[in-house]
Amino acid sequence: MLESRRAREQSGRDSFSRYRAQVRSAAVATLSILEGLDVDRVYCDLHDDFVIRKNDGSGLTYIFYQVKTKGKQNHNWSINELFGLKSKLKDQSKQCSKSIKESFIGKLLLHTVVFDQFCNSVVFQSNIHNSDEVIDLMDDIESGSFSNKFTAVLIDRFNECFGEGAEKYTLEQIKERLSKLCFQSDVSYLKEGDSFFDLVVKEKIYQFSEIELERAEFREILLRLLDLVERKSSGVIKTWDAESIETFAGISIDDLLSILSISKDAYLALLNGGDPNAVRSASMIQRSLKAGGADISAVMYCSRCKIDWDLWFRNARHIVPELELLSISERIGSTLWKSVGPQGMLAVSTLRQPIRDLLIELESHGLKFDLTEDLILGGIFSALVKGKS
């Protein structure tokens, strides 16, 4: 009976679908934090759909994302839908400044003014493609030509639309701000259905942490990740300060370590010890030991041993002949692969005797130097991490 009459409206369903796409995109963005490079925060539903913070040698900058989807996959975004520009208007001086300012791209370009040098870029992300006119406009900006008729309108109206107070931007300043605009079109994980999104998330988790997840384990992590993004996207931030923004909108490495059940202490120890792949190392050490029944104290102990080994090895490269270092590393690798169990399981108790035997062997070949049982143990876990990278 219900199907016999079409519903008066389905705007709620459409709005929920768009919100779901926004959450998915932010969830994928948060996983880039695991890479351990310059992305250290993602802020959800703050100033725009989400914001990525980059922290490099020159300081903090922000990438503002706006996520828009369309149900019809064969639809292309028009220049009017995105920029508020009428494509068939012969006299470009009659373009409406208000339409430009209130358009999707107009709202993104405002960030380049409000946040000035702290705005790294602004991104329009979608599940569909752009029209040829939009592509031509972006090619014109990216090439540095700025000769397209629609680009000329944006330049001409920039101060009227986005100028703050009496401040007027020069031609070069306007070009610099327009050049911060980027498009990410036909994004697979924004399309209908879960298969693309699930695949991207699983690949990124493996890429940054070397965790091979069983189906049930992956679903649990995925649900926790989506729940985290939804929580950070909801509610009003009543006290507008840095601490409140971090608490109610920000996602950091701490949140992701919790979701992936990776020891924060082990991660920090490895990070502070100079390991550039601290997430991956902590994950692999923890999973191999926990498979053998170890607790978190064993994870911390083995992580510290790996740090000490890495430091010893870096220093030894300047003192010990390379052939001898290679011989030591080869013997440690052999000890590892003789000791590792099913699914990469390692138990500290089963490593004691092989480590002692290896030290005796190294001494007999004049390769012991100042190596200890703890350093050899660290070398074994260093070999484990390198072997799976």
Language model region names:
Residues 1-17, 69-354:
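Acidic metal-coordinating catalytic centers involved in nucleic-acid phosphodiester chemistry
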Residues 38-40, 58-63, 117-121, 365-367, ...:
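Generic structural motif recognizing short loop/turn segments at the entrances and edges of beta-strands
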Residues 350-389:
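Hydrophobic, glycine-enriched assembly/anchoring segments
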Residues 12-16, 22-84, 101:
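Catalytic centers of nucleases
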Residues 51-52, 130, 244, 311, ...:
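Low-complexity, compositionally biased segments
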